[in-house]
C-alpha cells in the first residue's frame, strides 16, 4: 500500500469520524519516517490550515506499555484545531471525533523557534496556559502501533488554551509543584500529581 493510499484512508477516516483497522494489524509496517510522511500528506488532504504549534504525545513513559509505544510522538496543531478561552470555559463538539479522550495540559508558547544547529538549543518561553487537548483515535479501542499513531497526526483532535500567563524567573519552579484537579459532573474525579501525568 502506497503512502498516498494510506493518507487517503486516514484523511477520510478523520473527515467522516469513522474508525479504521490499524495498518500494523494488516501487516503494513511503516518506518517512523514513513509514518511522518503519511501524516504530512494527510494534512494536505484535509485542506490548507496554518500550523500554529506542535503537540508531543506519549511523554509519560508509565503508559508506554499500555499503548505498546516506545518513544514520544509529534503532531501538528493547526489554526482550525486550536481554540482560546480567557474565561477557561469552552464547549467542544465531540461528534466530529471517533473515540475522543480529554487530557489536561500545560500549554507552552516559545518566544521563537529553537535552532538545533549546535547541540542543545536555547529555549525561551513567552507564556504558559492551562489547557485541554481532545485526543482522538481513528483506530478502535485505542489499539495501534507507534507508527499508526504518528500517521494519523499524533492522535491530535483539538486543543483549548485557557488564560495565558507571562513567564517569569519563578515559573519553572512553580510548574514543578502545580496541581490539577479533574471534575466530572461537578464531582472531583481525580487529582494526580504532576509527576504522574
Regions found by a protein language model. Give the residues of each.
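Catalytic-core "active-site belt" of small-molecule-metabolizing enzymes
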Residues: 2-188
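Conserved small/polar residues in nucleotide/adenosyl-binding loops
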Residues: 189-196
Amino acid at each position: 500500500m502506497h503512502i498516498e493510499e494510506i493518507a487517503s484512508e486516514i484523511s477520510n477516516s478523520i473527515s467522516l469520524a469513522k474508525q479504521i483497522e490499524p495498518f500494523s494489524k494488516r501487516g503494513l509496517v511503516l518506518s517512523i519516517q514513513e509514518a511522518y510522511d503519511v501524516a504530512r500528506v494527510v494534512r494536505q488532504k484535509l485542506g490548507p490550515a496554518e500550523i500554529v504549534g506542535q503537540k508531543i504525545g506519549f511523554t509519560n513513559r508509565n503508559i508506554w506499555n499500555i499503548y505498546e509505544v516506545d518513544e514520544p510522538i509529534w503532531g501538528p496543531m493547526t489554526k482550525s484545531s486550536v481554540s482560546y478561552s480567557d474565561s477557561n470555559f469552552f464547549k467542544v463538539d465531540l461528534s466530529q471525533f471517533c473515540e475522543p479522550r480529554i487530557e489536561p495540559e500545560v500549554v507552552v508558547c516559545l518566544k521563537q523557534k529553537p535552532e538545533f544547529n549546535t547541540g542543545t538549543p536555547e529555549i525561551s518561553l513567552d507564556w504558559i496556559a492551562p489547557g485541554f487537548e481532545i485526543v482522538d483515535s481513528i483506530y478502535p479501542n485505542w489499539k495501534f502501533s507507534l507508527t499508526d499513531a504518528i500517521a494519523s497526526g499524533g492522535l491530535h483532535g483539538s486543543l483549548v488554551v485557557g488564560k495565558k500567563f507571562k513567564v517569569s524567573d519563578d515559573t519553572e519552579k512553580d510548574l514543578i509543584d502545580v496541581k490539577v484537579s479533574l471534575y466530572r459532573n461537578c464531582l472531583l474525579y481525580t487529582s494526580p500529581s504532576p509527576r504522574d501525568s
